[in-house]
Amino acid sequence: MKLPIYLDYAATTPVDPRVAEKMFQCMTMDGIFGNPASRSHRYGWQAEEAVDIARNQIAELINADHREIVFTSGATESNNLAIKGVAHFYHKKGKHIITSKTEHKAVLDTCRQLEREGFEVTYLEPAANGIIPMERLEAAMRDDTILVSIMHVNNEIGVIHDIDAIGELCRSKGIIFHMDAAQSAGKVPIDVQATKVDLISISGHKMYGPKGIGALYVRRKPRIRLEAQMHGGGHERGMRSGTLPTHQIVGLGEAAAIAKAEMASDDARIGALRDKLWNGIKHIEETYINGDAIERVSGSLNVSFNYVEGESLMMALKDLAVSSGSACTSASLEPSYVLRALGLNDEMAHSSIRFSIGRFTTEEEIDHAIEVITQSIDKLREMSPLWEMFKDGIDLNQVQWAHH
């Protein structure tokens, strides 16, 4: 067993060896290294064919048409292109956008930028289980609302939104629906023929593909128009210029094909490991799951250990590669804004750990994790004056702390 045990699959996944092998075939002189836009010789034609195959593989994962797939550098760029692209193209129709307070920073900061440009954004509060209630979404809709951007699966707490219901509501009001699927593509079934979603952001490195590559699904019927954010050679039907990185695209395509073929078996195995982990630690006093316990992606478990300081817990769990929030904000000592939005106080938000399990996690690793977590919590609480006060029956919310 390799230490530390990797339980941070929501931050990134290792590239599947089958994906890495395919990628390597597109890099050297012996392989398919040509520029897919070079139409005058075989090297370019081979590269273009490899890109076309990958585009089809990604389209098949979400039951889309291959012409609806636009390659980007990742979900952050896809989110930027979708949200800014719609806002800039449809600004004459309206300047109101709806999103939620628990979105990834790539959505929130894009919306903040649009606010600086004169757009108006409504940030919806989730319910205590982390899911946006439909009535709140409907109540926020206005005549000048042009876009709703709600994530499929939350990156910190793993809850799954009812995208079918959101899609129906948006379509009935003539509002474009964008979905950030960085955490769900390849893990949760997505069918664009059944779900009325107009734009989907996809990330390669969250589904055992390479970093630095992603895709944006852009619906053709009814047709969604975007204003390009990257200008140049007019690649990707003018929506995203830049030489296509054949090796990364082939990697993303292979990752999508494997995910589609193995989704059900992966989901069952990973879900069983997640349940094993929770069943092994839920007996620890004052331990709580954050987010809905049922409507969640199989590999995610976000737990608050009350009366334990998050950073000291992270240090105590040095044998486990886990996080106290999203990797993109883990350098910050601020408590998770997602957990705060669920109504957790600073202390509870600070004492939370995100465990995310994936394709290469083993039973042995989960057994070891349970042991390490149990021992660490006991040890830290033994040293905690707050835990002692709580055990003595003192209501810590009533304590008047002296200010220095």
UniProtKB/Swiss-Prot annotation:
This is Cysteine desulfurase IscS. Homodimer. Forms a heterotetramer with IscU, interacts with other sulfur acceptors. InterPro entries: Aminotrans_V_dom (IPR000192), Aminotrans_V_PyrdxlP_BS (IPR020578), Cys_deSase_IscS (IPR010240), Cysteine_dSase (IPR016454), PyrdxlP-dep_Trfase (IPR015424), PyrdxlP-dep_Trfase_major (IPR015421), PyrdxlP-dep_Trfase_small (IPR015422). GO terms for molecular function: 2 iron, 2 sulfur cluster binding; cysteine desulfurase activity; metal ion binding; pyridoxal phosphate binding. Pathway: Cofactor biosynthesis; iron-sulfur cluster biosynthesis. Belongs to the class-V pyridoxal-phosphate-dependent aminotransferase family. NifS/IscS subfamily. Master enzyme that delivers sulfur to a number of partners involved in Fe-S cluster assembly, tRNA modification or cofactor biosynthesis. Catalyzes the removal of elemental sulfur atoms from cysteine to produce alanine. Functions as a sulfur delivery protein for Fe-S cluster synthesis onto IscU, an Fe-S scaffold assembly protein, as well as other S acceptor proteins. Gene3D superfamilies: Aspartate Aminotransferase, domain 1, Type I PLP-dependent aspartate aminotransferase-like (Major domain). Its cofactor is pyridoxal 5'-phosphate. The active site is at C328 (cysteine persulfide intermediate). It is found in: Cytoplasm. Transmembrane segments: none annotated. It comes from the Bacteria. Pyridoxal 5'-phosphate binds at A75, T76, N155, Q183, S203, G204, H205, T243. It comes from Shewanella baltica (strain OS185). HAMAP family: Cys_desulf_IscS (MF_00331).
